[in-house]
Amino acid sequence: MKQVFGVFGDPIAHSLSPAMHNAAFSALGMDCIYHAFRVKPEKLEKAILGAEAMGFGGLNLTVPLKETALKLDCIKPDPLAEKIGAVNTIVFGETGEIKGYNTDGLGAKQALQNSAVEMEGSKIVVTGAGGAARSIAFQLAADGAEITIVNRTEGRAIELAKDISAASLSGNVTGKGLSGLKNLLQDANILINTTTLGMHPNVDTAIATAEDLHPDLTVFDIVYNPLETRLLREAKASGAKTVSGVLMLVYQGAEAFKLWTGIEPPVELMKKTVLEALQV
């Protein structure tokens, strides 16, 4: 019998995770299958316990379940997931323990590293202060990065920066309002956009234009629909290096795969599968 893995969320119909993980299982000759399941927050604990009872191999969680999962008594979060305040990967232990992890920030970090972006000593600007910004900023702060979080509502950026600072991580984190973005970018090495600006169908919007950017900057947009956002086009026009949001999706999935199976997945195949799905 195939071992089942899955992703819980609501909505979930357009998830690319099943195609990505099933391609990896098939390539490795593993008798496993990955499905998407629509689960509402109030049913999450029952769904997780049901998956455990049925012998699922592991789970991913997506919107709007990541924060809900951390509050469940049945899940033991790892220290970083607890600090972030969100879980996106569930591992069922052999002793009955259900462990929660957050691979989003690690996925973003690896997307940058595997695009030959120099991280050490870099000044990083993160736009947005939602769940994705939180995961990424916590991960990079744990690695000692200098980060400025910029958000339209300055108070949210400052609050997130305080949360990260209170976690006693080695990085230096501050929060600013959107009006200061242009000046911050002049001294920045990396810009990470975690807002939905530029996402389909609002494809003509961007957090910054070419005149705000420069050739010594790396611009990473976690939006991957469309594949090339307006921000990435503006970055190319300025001479900046660009990193696609597809890579974060793939690498966070690859980290989850390793947590479940202990096996290194075929990352290039996973990336190819996602790109093909997005181009249909």
UniProtKB/Swiss-Prot annotation:
GO terms for biological process: amino acid biosynthetic process; aromatic amino acid family biosynthetic process; chorismate biosynthetic process; shikimate metabolic process. It holds the Pfam family SDH_C. PANTHER family: BIFUNCTIONAL 3-DEHYDROQUINATE DEHYDRATASE_SHIKIMATE DEHYDROGENASE, CHLOROPLASTIC, SHIKIMATE DEHYDROGENASE. NADP(+) binds at G128, A129, G130, G131, A132, N151, R152, T153, E154, G155, R156, I222, G245. Homodimer. InterPro entries: Aminoacid_DH-like_N_sf (IPR046346), NAD(P)-bd_dom_sf (IPR036291), SDH_C (IPR041121), Shikimate_DH (IPR011342), Shikimate_DH-bd_N (IPR013708), Shikimate_DH_fam (IPR022893), Shikm_DH/Glu-tRNA_Rdtase (IPR006151). Its EC number is 1.1.1.25. The keyword Amino-acid biosynthesis applies. It comes from Methanosarcina barkeri (strain Fusaro / DSM 804). Pathway: Metabolic intermediate biosynthesis; chorismate biosynthesis; chorismate from D-erythrose 4-phosphate and phosphoenolpyruvate: step 4/7. This is Shikimate dehydrogenase (NADP(+)). Shikimate binds at S15, L16, S17, T62, N88, D104, Y224. One of its GO terms (molecular function) is NADP binding. Belongs to the shikimate dehydrogenase family. Keywords: Amino-acid biosynthesis, Aromatic amino acid biosynthesis, NADP, Oxidoreductase. Gene3D superfamilies: Leucine Dehydrogenase, chain A, domain 1, NAD(P)-binding Rossmann-like Domain. The gene is aroE. Involved in the biosynthesis of the chorismate, which leads to the biosynthesis of aromatic amino acids. Catalyzes the reversible NADPH linked reduction of 3-dehydroshikimate (DHSA) to yield shikimate (SA). It catalyses: shikimate + NADP(+) = 3-dehydroshikimate + NADPH + H(+). The keyword NADP applies. The active site is at K66.
